[in-house]
């Protein structure tokens, strides 16, 4: 089930939440900063934890499209969050093409696969790359729905996938694509 929700992803109750990170996990702005601040209180501390996890899990200092890094939820655990899954979407700067769509699909799919591997039943995503990375929200939502619909039938544990949008305007745009009751 895919459902669009208006709200703050840092307060959302799901077993895993996805962070739309940059490839160095620096959490300098947008949803990445908000998640880091909510998780650790001190963003620099969450950056340190994230970079350490990246070196342990990937053996390098950056994430490619499709790769993910998992960090503990720390203070987000009070919302039922067990994992924060960091993924990197494409930078669009207002444009959109097949290459950007392909990179976004990899980012979404990587997070879905990791969540399923971890045995979670619910996951919340922000609109990856639609914020400061400048990808058109409608294209991001369409791609998100396409990837999730392809993935869910084969999922072992994952049952609920939420797209959490902060602004009313973004929520309404996404709702037009996904529909009131979800997919």
From Swiss-Prot:
Cross-referenced Pfam families: Macro
Gene3D superfamilies, alphabetized: Leucine Aminopeptidase, subunit E, domain 1
PROSITE patterns per record: MACRO (PS51154)
InterPro entries named in the record: Macro_dom, Macro_dom-like
SUPFAM superfamilies in UniProt: Macro domain-like (SSF52949)
All copies of domain Macro, residue ranges: 1-182
Listed name of the protein: Uncharacterized protein PF1536
Source organism of the structure: Pyrococcus furiosus (strain ATCC 43587 / DSM 3638 / JCM 8422 / Vc1)
